[in-house]
């Protein structure tokens, strides 16, 4: 009877080995010593049946959360023991076992194997790998080296397993309650974004604040008709997209500010495309209505050119004419924001451990690392231990947007916190964990993971690897950013590219504009996994550096046809090839023999072409195809052969078919792939 190791079963069930060991011993009475212990397939099948499904796994992790936390906390101690050379008594196996991460240096591997570094380097050379003493090698290469020394290797589990399972925990519907919406303001420079934010803040500031002055922490809340709105005071789509590129989708509604006297400008178009790419609802604030040249109808007309039709004209985009200077229609704008957010039914569970995102962070001379956190779920309390990206800390003090010290903050509430070990990056996710020790060990594990991932190749989409990514199912559409020297070229390339879309793969131009390829374009491409195409323009120095850093492909052309053909070639490569049938040969059945435990063997004469072993065949009787299968065997006299040519006799059997009769014709054929030349 076959067996399975505990760690292999744990991988299948997506639970930590430690938890599975406890369950096996406590719940099922199966004696296991460690993750390398083996259990019978029957026991494994029963456990799979009982623990299958995410709900069961979540309950399992919740039940053994203490053990998980203990495992994470003891990770650092285990590392120290390994450095001292102490052996792990728990591995009572005949074969020696070592634990390594996704990558390891040659020196570290030699220490774990307890072998001289020179011997390990020689072994690597014999396996075809040239590596120096401090060079990193991947897990598969290390495994091959360990096999030479008869040592088993397994990949160690991430030490932040507890946090990952906490994040996967299902949310109870009855615990969800309404939360305030989070709003970001975007638009062209000098169109009044900051003035509008100031007008909103001054008109809705609470009387309890000293002098009505709000401390700048990167976000603030206002009260509208008894409802709370949270504004991110980080105007500009660059910050918005940079955070989205880090996986932080925190905005619920975007206010797009357009000057009534200026209309749609290049940065306005960028902001529109960024919002569309993020799939966030927009409300247009037509600002500067107090100016003499204000023309809101012109703004509405220009919006339609970018796919935004306002409600007045039969569309679904809300547009509100406002004036930040006179505060005209500010209340109406806020009511529209409230209405849009209500349509989304925004909810969160305030009773959970807090999770959220860093809005901004800085190093203060007197207070150390200071970060503005936006709580997205749960409630953050003073004294909580948190992990933020690859840093950690314990919250020593918390302040709201008015600078007042508070003890807790619920969903959608921004707070400034002190107590972090380092300054995190904007867009980093934070999670409350059991204690500071757990947070520290998780942060160390994350730093190690980041270091290892820096050695891995980028998996950004590119024209060259588009076909393989489609096959893997990782790309369903090709997103493109187009920059050109004139608007006519942008429109021509955009129209031509979008015509290339097929049922399998859609080409989507997420942004098109006039001018050099900028760092902002690269940021959007990184966030949307897009390719940047330039026509008669070049990337600036910052864009080149950003594209190399983020692994974004930038293609430049001088002929529109070349750009279209490159994309078309990549698209053709994505499509499944066409197949045509090629007949290999035919044979006539002249005798049949029935053999027990084998079936019917046919003796035949090859009429045309050749018969090839394992070829697809048709059995034809009186001109009618009666069966299709494969040649199971092919012999000439007593010898197995690969093929028999025309004019020779042979013996063969047809897979899963015994009703062969004299006079039947066997037609052998193959299906050849033909490269597609057009979409």
Swiss-Prot record:
Cellular compartments per GO CC: cytosol
Classification via InterPro entries: EF-G-like_DII, EFTu-like_2, IF2_II, IF2_N, P-loop_NTPase, Small_GTP-bd, T_Tr_GTP-bd_dom, TF_IF2_bacterial-like
Region (G5): 323-325
Segments for region (G1): 187-194
Binding-site list for GTP: 187-194, 233-237, 287-290
Region (G4): 287-290
tr-type G domain mapped to chain residues: 178-347
CDD domains: IF2_eIF5B, IF2_mtIF2_II, mtIF2_IVc
Family: Belongs to the TRAFAC class translation factor GTPase superfamily. Classic translation factor GTPase family. IF-2 subfamily.
GO molecular function, one term: GTP binding
Region of interest (G3), ranges: 233-236
Highest taxon of the lineage: Bacteria
Record's keyword annotation contains Metal-binding: no
Keywords: Cytoplasm, GTP-binding, Initiation factor, Nucleotide-binding, Protein biosynthesis
Biological role stated in the UniProt entry: One of the essential components for the initiation of protein synthesis. Protects formylmethionyl-tRNA from spontaneous hydrolysis and promotes its binding to the 30S ribosomal subunits. Also involved in the hydrolysis of GTP during the formation of the 70S ribosomal complex.
Residues covered by region (G2): 212-216
Protein name: Translation initiation factor IF-2
Location(s) in or outside the cell: Cytoplasm
Entries under SUPFAM superfamilies matching the protein: Initiation factor IF2/eIF5b, domain 3, P-loop containing nucleoside triphosphate hydrolases, Translation proteins
């Amino acid at each position: 009877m076959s067996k399975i190791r505990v760690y292999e079963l744990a991988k299948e069930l997506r639970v930590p080995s430690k938890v599975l060991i406890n369950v096996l011993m406590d719940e099922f009475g199966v004696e296991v010593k460690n993750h390398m212990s083996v259990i019978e397939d029957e026991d494994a099948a029963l456990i799979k049946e009982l623990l299958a499904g995410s709900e069961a796994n979540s309950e399992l992790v919740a039940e053994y959360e203490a053990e998980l936390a203990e495992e994470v906390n003891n990770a650092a101690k285990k590392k120290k023991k390994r450095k001292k050379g102490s052996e792990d008594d728990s591995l009572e196996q005949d074969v020696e076992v070592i634990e390594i991460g996704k990558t390891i240096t040659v020196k570290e591997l030699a220490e774990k194997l307890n072998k001289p570094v020179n011997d390990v380097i020689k072994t690597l050379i014999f396996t075809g790998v040239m590596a120096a003493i401090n060079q990193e090698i991947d897990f598969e290469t290390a495994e091959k080296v360990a096999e030479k020394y008869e040592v088993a290797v397994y990949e160690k589990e991430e030490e932040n397993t507890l946090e990952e399972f906490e994040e996967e925990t299902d949310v109870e519907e009855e615990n969800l309650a309404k939360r305030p919406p989070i709003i970001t303001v975007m638009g062209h420079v000098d169109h009044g974004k900051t003035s509008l934010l100031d007008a909103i803040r001054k008109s809705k500031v609470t009387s309890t604040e000293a002098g009505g002055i709000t401390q700048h922490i990167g976000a603030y809340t206002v009260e509208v008709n008894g409802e709370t709105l949270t504004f991110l005071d980080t105007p500009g789509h660059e910050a918005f997209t940079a955070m989205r590129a880090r996986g932080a989708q925190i905005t619920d509604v975007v206010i797009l500010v357009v000057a009534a006297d200026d209309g749609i400008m290049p940065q306005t178009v960028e902001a529109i495309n960024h919002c569309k790419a993020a799939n966030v609802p927009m409300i247009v604030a037509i600002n500067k209505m107090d100016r003499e040249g204000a023309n809101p109808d012109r703004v509405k007309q220009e919006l339609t050119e970018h796919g935004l039709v306002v409600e007045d004209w039969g569309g679904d985009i809300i547009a509100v004419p406002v004036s930040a200077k006179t505060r005209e229609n500010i209340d109406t704008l806020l009511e529209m924001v409230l209405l849009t957010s209500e349509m989304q039914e925004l909810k969160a569970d305030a009773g959970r451990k807090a999770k959220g995102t860093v809005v901004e962070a800085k190093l203060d001379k007197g207070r150390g690392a200071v970060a503005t956190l936006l709580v997205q779920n749960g409630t953050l309390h003073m004294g909580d231990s948190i992990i933020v990206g690859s840093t950690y800390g314990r919250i020593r003090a918390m302040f709201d947007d008015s600078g007042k010290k508070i003890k807790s903050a619920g969903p959608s509430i921004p707070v400034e916190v002190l107590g972090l070990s380092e300054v995190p990056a904007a867009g980093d996710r934070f999670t409350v964990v059991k204690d500071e020790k757990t947070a520290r060990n998780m942060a160390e594990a994350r730093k190690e993971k980041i270091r290892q991932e820096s050695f891995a190749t980028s998996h950004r989409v590119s024209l060259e690897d588009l076909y393989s990514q489609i096959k893997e199912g990782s790309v369903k559409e090709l997103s493109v950013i187009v920059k050109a020297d004139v608007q006519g070229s942008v429109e021509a390339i955009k129209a031509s590219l979008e015509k290339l879309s097929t049922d399998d793969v859609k080409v989507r131009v997420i942004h098109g504009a006039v001018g050099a390829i900028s760092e902002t374009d690269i940021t959007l491409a990184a966030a949307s996994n897009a390719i940047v195409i330039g026509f008669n323009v070049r990337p600036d120095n910052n864009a080149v550096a950003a594209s190399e850093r983020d692994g974004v492909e930038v293609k430049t052309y001088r002929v529109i046809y070349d750009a279209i053909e490159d994309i078309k070639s990549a698209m053709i490569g994505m499509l499944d090839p066409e197949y045509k049938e090629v007949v290999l040969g035919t044979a006539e059945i002249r005798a049949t023999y029935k053999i027990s435990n084998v079936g019917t063997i046919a003796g035949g004469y090859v009429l045309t072409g050749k018969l090839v072993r394992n070829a697809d065949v048709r059995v034809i009787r009186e001109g009618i195809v009666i069966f299709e299968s494969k040649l199971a065997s092919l012999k000439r006299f007593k010898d197995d052969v690969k093929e028999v040519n025309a004019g020779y006799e042979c013996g063969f059997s047809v897979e899963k078919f015994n009703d062969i009769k004299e006079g039947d014709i066997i037609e052998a054929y193959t299906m050849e792939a033909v490269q597609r030349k057009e979409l």
